[in-house]
Amino acid sequence: MIAKLKGILDSITDSYLIIDINGVGYQVYSSGKTLMKLIKEEGSIVSLFIETHVREDRIHLFGFLDNTEKVAFNMLQSVSGIGTKMALHILSNLTPHQLQIAISSQNRHQLKAISGVGPKLIDRLMIELRDKVANINTIANNTSLAILSTDSNTHDNILSDAITALIALGISRAEATQILSDIYALFPSISVNELVRTALQRRAK
């Protein structure tokens, strides 16, 4: 399960973006608000929280700049009749905070202003999310901490495996640690094999 992606923002369309990670392009669907924020970042390194949906014939990735929007996205889909497309459509018009306020205050007008959101859907949103929206920030913060912990563990494992590989080739631990740390700092998405290969190439120069 992909929870986060970090790579070069290759291109943006009106409904999705493509992130290039080591030559592999990942198509990631996002809300209009997220796409607008990233439109000036093409060619730069970006990081997105990811929600992965696996179907029989395909895998869909949905990306968010912050975990609060990801939580709101999943919360919206818990409402009867709302799928991924409508959830992104709502978040293209309202931020998670605006959505939270609209439902908490039972502000139907704010939701009614969104095209495709009719009275029956508004009723379901008000009823089914009324007791949930207050927890958006808490859930987002807890999930972010878990992802940060996972990222840290992944970083440590990659470096540790690469160091072990270089030591097996007769390179001292101190030298292996130094050269691998330098490379990993420049290429945080690199795999163990690529990290070892790059280290050997750099050492041979």
Swiss-Prot record:
Residues 145-153 are annotated as: Flexible linker. One of its GO terms (cellular component) is Holliday junction helicase complex. The keyword Iron does not apply. Residues 154-205 are annotated as: Domain III. Residues 66-144 are annotated as: Domain II. One of its GO terms (molecular function) is ATP binding. It holds the Pfam family HHH_5. CDD domains: UBA_RuvA_C. Keywords: Cytoplasm, DNA damage, DNA recombination, DNA repair, DNA-binding. SUPFAM superfamilies: DNA helicase RuvA subunit, C-terminal domain (SSF46929), Nucleic acid-binding proteins (SSF50249), RuvA domain 2-like (SSF47781). It is found in: Cytoplasm. Residues 1-65 are annotated as: Domain I. Has three domains with a flexible linker between the domains II and III and assumes an 'L' shape. Domain III is highly mobile and contacts RuvB. HAMAP family: DNA_HJ_migration_RuvA. NCBIfam families: ruvA (TIGR00084). The RuvA-RuvB-RuvC complex processes Holliday junction (HJ) DNA during genetic recombination and DNA repair, while the RuvA-RuvB complex plays an important role in the rescue of blocked DNA replication forks via replication fork reversal (RFR). RuvA specifically binds to HJ cruciform DNA, conferring on it an open structure. The RuvB hexamer acts as an ATP-dependent pump, pulling dsDNA into and through the RuvAB complex. HJ branch migration allows RuvC to scan DNA until it finds its consensus sequence, where it cleaves and resolves the cruciform DNA. Homotetramer. Forms an RuvA(8)-RuvB(12)-Holliday junction (HJ) complex. HJ DNA is sandwiched between 2 RuvA tetramers; dsDNA enters through RuvA and exits via RuvB. An RuvB hexamer assembles on each DNA strand where it exits the tetramer. Each RuvB hexamer is contacted by two RuvA subunits (via domain III) on 2 adjacent RuvB subunits; this complex drives branch migration. In the full resolvosome a probable DNA-RuvA(4)-RuvB(12)-RuvC(2) complex forms which resolves the HJ. This is Holliday junction branch migration complex subunit RuvA. The gene is ruvA.
